[in-house]
């Protein structure tokens, strides 16, 4: 049975949950001269996988993490990597805005709860994205502040310490099982909502019960879950 949602704080992943994550379009443009269109999706998958591996290593600022993941993907594909490739892709991150379902939902939630962001982001990127969300946030917490990225436990423990509350009082919301829902579960966050934007393959029979989360298809469903 899923736990009743009665949070003191609602924390959110940013990129891919609130902010429309758009790293693939500029990557397609940058590498159009080196990767055929019929292979581009596979290259993008590898780039994503290396980002997922890079967050587990020694801390580095997010722009450098993206560049290093891109460099590793290029090495795997035996194609040239140029420093300008990574710079061009990283430069678009602060331009990303919210998904269409986000502003109204956040505005409604902000009337009842203090909202928090916990993002794998650098300080010089995230605030431009947050400004576009149009809602007040009690705290914006980043990987740069924590010295670690999700899914590392250190990032979540940093948030718990900054909020000064018990983890049972935090409702954590994310579109990623890998980066957020699974580590939050292992850290015994009892209140979790998975925003299923279709990024990750989910076998409901295999995952929902072990990780004990509520699920919505987009953020507009979250106020309803909370009875607002």
Where would I find each of the regions flagged by the language model?
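N-terminal helical cap/lid subdomain that shapes the substrate entry/recognition surface
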Residues: 2-100, 124
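Asp-based, Mg2+/Mn2+-dependent phosphohydrolase catalytic module
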Residues: 1-9, 103, 107, 113-228
């Amino acid at each position: 049975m899923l736990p009743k949602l009665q949070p003191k704080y609602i924390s959110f992943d940013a990129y891919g949950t609130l902010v429309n994550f758009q790293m693939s379009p500029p990557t397609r443009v940058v590498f159009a001269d080196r990767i055929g269109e019929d292979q581009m999706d596979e290259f993008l998958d590898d780039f994503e996988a290396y980002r997922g591996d890079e967050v587990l290593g020694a801390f580095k600022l997010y722009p450098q993490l993206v560049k290093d993941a891109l460099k590793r993907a290029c090495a795997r594909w035996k194609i040239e990597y140029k420093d300008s490739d990574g710079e061009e892709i990283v430069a678009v991150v602060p331009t990303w805005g919210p998904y269409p379902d986000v502003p109204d939902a956040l505005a409604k939630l902000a009337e009842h709860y203090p909202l928090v962001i916990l993002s794998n982001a650098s300080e010089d990127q995230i605030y431009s994205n947050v400004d576009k969300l149009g809602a007040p946030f009690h705290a914006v917490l980043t990987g740069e502040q924590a010295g670690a990225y999700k899914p590392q436990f250190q990032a979540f423990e940093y948030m718990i310490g900054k909020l000064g509350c018990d983890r049972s009082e935090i409702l954590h919301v994310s579109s990623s099982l890998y980066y957020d829902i699974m580590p939050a579960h292992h850290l015994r966050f009892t209140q979790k909502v998975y925003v299923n934007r279709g990024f990750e393959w989910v076998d409901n029979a295999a995952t929902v019960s072990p990780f004990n989360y509520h699920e919505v298809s987009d953020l507009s469903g979250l106020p309803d879950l909370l009875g607002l």
